[in-house]
Amino acid sequence: MEALVYTFLLVSTLGIIFFAIFFREPPKVPTKGGK
């Protein structure tokens, strides 16, 4: 059970870091319905 909890925490942490870096940098790909 503990392994599952630690795995979930690890994945969630990596996901948050990934999204933080992704949204911090300006998107190079132009959005189809963007401004």
UniProtKB/Swiss-Prot annotation:
It is a single-pass membrane protein. The keyword Transmembrane applies. The chain crosses the membrane at residues 3-23. Keywords: Chloroplast, Membrane, Photosynthesis, Photosystem II, Plastid, Thylakoid, Transmembrane, Transmembrane helix. Found at the monomer-monomer interface of the photosystem II (PS II) dimer, plays a role in assembly and dimerization of PSII. PSII is a light-driven water plastoquinone oxidoreductase, using light energy to abstract electrons from H(2)O, generating a proton gradient subsequently used for ATP formation. PSII is composed of 1 copy each of membrane proteins PsbA, PsbB, PsbC, PsbD, PsbE, PsbF, PsbH, PsbI, PsbJ, PsbK, PsbL, PsbM, PsbT, PsbY, PsbZ, Psb30/Ycf12, at least 3 peripheral proteins of the oxygen-evolving complex and a large number of cofactors. It forms dimeric complexes. This is Photosystem II reaction center protein T.
